């Protein structure tokens, strides 16, 4: 966090990428300078619970969701629109609690390459495309691949989606964590990967809110037609 975040930030700024920052609310208390840098950069903050305790192990899941949303809103001035559960964990009640707390989209359901509307007892929530394979924890910490796997796997994944996008829009999520993607021996692979993807015609880098807004105004209408 103290070093890797700033390396990633330089890459994002160099390539004009405004990512979604999936934020444990506790970071607002422990590393406020990092959260402020995200806000100053114009990056979206979404909630990642208070800390990394799995949702099914919380004594009061609803209270932790509300606490997390409130802390980030108080610090940033904006209530998060999105939510990622720690380790993508949920219970059967999570979506209902999230909808009640004002969450509009989640990234916990790795089920499609396009947004999907999910009904809850409150208001619908949109599941945005997430990927647990183009993900630095999986590639580097769990599967123990060399650093260049970052570039090769991401481009292989992108090439298929790019070809399919000739028929309908596709979305590709890439997960970066400062302590993995922000280290010296990986950061060049991260930068090269994003640069090559963005060099293709018709490709844009959007945060979660932009994807959500597109889906709510155009995507669902396209599917209904």
Regions found by a protein language model. Give the residues of each.
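Binuclear metal-dependent hydrolase catalytic cores centered on His/Asp/Glu-rich metal-binding motifs
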Residues: 132-134, 138-153, 157
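Catalytic alpha-helical scaffold of carbohydrate-active enzymes acting on polysaccharides/glycoconjugates
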Residues: 1-126, 151-174, 180-225
């Amino acid at each position: 966090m103290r070093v890797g975040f700033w390396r990633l930030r330089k890459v994002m700024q160099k390539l004009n990428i405004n990512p979604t920052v999936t934020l444990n609310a506790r970071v607002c208390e422990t590393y406020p300078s990092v959260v402020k840098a995200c806000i100053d950069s114009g990056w979206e903050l979404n909630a990642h619970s208070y800390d990394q305790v799995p949702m099914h192990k919380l004594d009061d899941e609803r209270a932790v969701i509300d606490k997390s949303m409130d802390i980030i809103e108080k610090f940033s001035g904006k209530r998060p629109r999105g939510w990622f559960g720690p380790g993508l964990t949920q219970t059967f009640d999570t979506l209902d609690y999230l909808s009640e707390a004002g969450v509009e989209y989640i990234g916990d359901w790795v089920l499609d390459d396009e947004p999907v509307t999910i009904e809850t007892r409150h208001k619908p929530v949109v599941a945005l495309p997430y990927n647990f394979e183009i993900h630095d924890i999986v590639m580097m910490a769990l599967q123990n691949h060399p650093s260049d796997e970052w570039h090769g796997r991401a481009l292989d994944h992108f090439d298929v989606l790019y070809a399919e996008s000739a028929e309908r829009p596709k979305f590709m999520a890439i997960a970066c964590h400062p302590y993995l993607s922000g280290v010296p021996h990986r950061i060049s692979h991260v930068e090269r990967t994003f640069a090559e993807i963005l060099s293709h015609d018709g490709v844009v880098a959007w945060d979660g809110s932009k994807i959500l807004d597109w889906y709510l105004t155009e995507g669902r209408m396209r599917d209904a037609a």
